[in-house]
Amino acid sequence: MPTYAPKAGDTTRSWYVIDATDVVLGRLAVAAANLLRGKHKPTFAPNVDGGDFVIVINADKVAISNEKLRNKRAYSHSGYPGGLRKRSIGELMEKHPDRVVEKAIVGMLPKNKLSRQIQSKLRVYAGPGHPHTAQQPVPFEIKQVAQ
């Protein structure tokens, strides 16, 4: 009997909701990236997008150390000469906490042809609410040591 090789339509996708309140940003990103890729499933294959949908709520309450809020920089470039913009993570957390969490999760995903397809299954919201109640998302608990 030949070895089973999963195909694109073989997997059923679930919806998970992760509450980011007091969760360390890196641990949140690893857990979300593993769910998005489907590494928790026995039918995981790196060449097939078999992952689940992930909703992250309360992105504004994620745990980041004060030193990183002050010193860690996020860079963006406009494309023009001298167009490099540097902002601290603290400044970005005040304006767009969902983008900080999304950038951390996307950074943990592979950089290949499937990456955009995997990224499209990620939804990040700064507040406690989300518009995906019709999909009946299952709460996903991140196990961590108390800080």
Swiss-Prot record:
The protein, known as: Large ribosomal subunit protein uL13
Annotated GO MF terms: mRNA binding; structural constituent of ribosome
Keyword Transferase: no
Gene3D superfamilies: Ribosomal protein L13
A Gene Ontology BP annotation from the UniProt entry: translation
PROSITE patterns tied to this protein: RIBOSOMAL_L13
Family named by the database record: Belongs to the universal ribosomal protein uL13 family.
Subunit structure: Part of the 50S ribosomal subunit.
S-S bonds: none
Classification via InterPro entries: Ribosomal_uL13, Ribosomal_uL13_bac-type, Ribosomal_uL13_CS, Ribosomal_uL13_sf
Domain of life: Bacteria
Classification of source organism: Bacteria, Bacillati, Actinomycetota, Actinomycetes, Mycobacteriales
GO terms under cellular component: cytosolic large ribosomal subunit
Any one Pfam family match given in the protein's UniProt record, by short name: Ribosomal_L13
Protein keywords: Ribonucleoprotein, Ribosomal protein
Free-text function comment from the UniProt entry: This protein is one of the early assembly proteins of the 50S ribosomal subunit, although it is not seen to bind rRNA by itself. It is important during the early stages of 50S assembly.
Organism: Mycobacterium ulcerans (strain Agy99)
PANTHER family for this protein: LARGE RIBOSOMAL SUBUNIT PROTEIN UL13M, RIBOSOMAL PROTEIN L13
